[in-house]
Amino acid sequence: MSAIVVLGAGPAGAAVALGLRRLGYPVTLVSEWRRFAALEGVSVRVLDALRAAGLDQALADAALPSQRQVSWNGQQHAQNIEFLLDRPRFDRGLREDLRQAGVEVIEGRVLTVKSSLAGYRIDIEGRAALSADFLVEARGRQAPAQGKGLRGPETVSLLNRWQGAPGSTASAVESLEHGWAWMARRADGQCYWQWTVDVGSVRLPGKAQLLDYCHQQRLQSALARTFFGDAPQPDVQLHARSSTAILSPQVCGKNWIRVGDAAMAVDPLSGNGVFQSLSSALQAPVVINTLLRKPERAALAQRFHQHRVEQLFLRFARTGRDFYADEQRWRQQPFWQARRTWPDTQVAQAKADFAALRIEPMPVLRDGFVDEADVVITPDQPLGIWHVQGLEVAPLLRRVWTEPVKDVLAGLTPEQSRVFKGWLVSQGYRPSPSPSGRGG
């Protein structure tokens, strides 16, 4: 059986490794530990996705509920509960999930990856080299770039972390003249403040003065002063990291695949990083299974992964663009001006339009492989809809175009009829006295 090596043990790499194990593949994963102790705010949807991917140990004691405050465009409100994910605990749990699933986990830094006709040679610091028939690149933003992809405005996030007094768990986000800040406080007193700024327009001081510069920014924020209180902020640790949105130009070949931030990394305002990583990774085991066991479908499998990643990236990017556009006070400031129009002017969620529906053959996931099937292309789903609650909709829509709807529904069970009628209405269908006469 093919030797598969996954590089990176974040959510994306772990999800792919676990998915491959469920398909019966032996998997080796190579990773080094994070260089800083991060905290991430995630939604219930993200926690559910992590559990569905089999990451149970990763979530044990790693997430604490918090009511998030929002101060945006001069308006304050409390949003839904978010969960603060302690990344060091989460990452330790990920490795435990992997080991329990039978994944060989190697701790070490990858020095080089060399490809040849025989596969891959992976050199690891302090260890013997590995050989692989198939490579999964999941090292996030640290993955080597592959040519010039789509990039958003150059952005950097400055994370400040310090130990405060124990208290209640809380989190907040606010827009600022030259960027935006996310802040969090854990019950044990660990405090986090992350300021995201524009690389080209903000003149940041040198590293020696950067901590004080960040401190002055917090002092100028009424929300931050209230959130963290007047207590001293001793021994603040600073970590700067790129948060520019990046889409890799190619994310899949015949014997390799990129997932998570290595495939697409988006602005942290556009959505949660963990969820974005999972979004591009959960489909990867089936893509890999197809490439290895049905090589005649290689082009179809590559097309499936490439298009899914591209559409996910654009959807997240447009969501972030709309958040930036909501801030009206500093429209002309470089940070806000650059981000309120990128990546394009296309709406994030297109309105339903029954007249715009069409049917095309597209790649789908069927029985553990990428296959081709007729799907319904909609304004909001350019990759198509194959099933709705288990009901294949393209054949039924073809009949709706040429037959009375009641005749189409007559062949369905009551539950299927309810599902299909609901889907038709959601796509803008309105009953009319005569059929449209449209062909498919």
Residues of each region from the PLM?
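Glycine-rich FAD pyrophosphate-binding loop
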Residues: 9, 18-39
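Acidic, low-complexity/disordered tracts enriched in E/D and polar residues
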Residues: 337-399, 418-433, 437-440
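Short beta-strand to alpha-helix junction loop
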Residues: 77-97, 202-206
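Beta1/beta-strand and adjacent pyrophosphate-binding region of the FAD-binding site
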Residues: 1-12
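N-terminal FAD cofactor-binding segment of flavoenzymes
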Residues: 33-69
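Mid-to-C-terminal Rossmann-like scaffold of FAD/NAD(P)H-dependent oxidoreductases
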Residues: 303-359
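Predominantly flavin-linked oxidoreductase catalytic cores and closely associated redox partners
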Residues: 99-229, 247, 264
